[in-house]
């Protein structure tokens, strides 16, 4: 399940994922939020917390993540992935060189540093 997080500027898509993440999470939560931010801002930022209760992601959701990332590819200014899930951290680090903006992975213990970084000028 994915939910939106409060306390971030409008250009930051701030989400938290836990349990099993589905295509419906992307279609009903993530994609509408990205589209709304993209209508108002030239550049976008993403803050994505993946909780300790993360139980996996459906292949269709992974595809939606990839697709929406590519659709707005040039607009991603910063991406912060906050996770202790090793394979997610490795995947983000492996693909970050493809992103035009800055991408960082933070452990869950550094959430506050990740939040500060994603909102910094």
Indicate where each model-derived feature is located.
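Amphipathic, Lys/Arg-enriched alpha-helical "gate/interface" segment within cytosolic domains
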Residues: 2-121
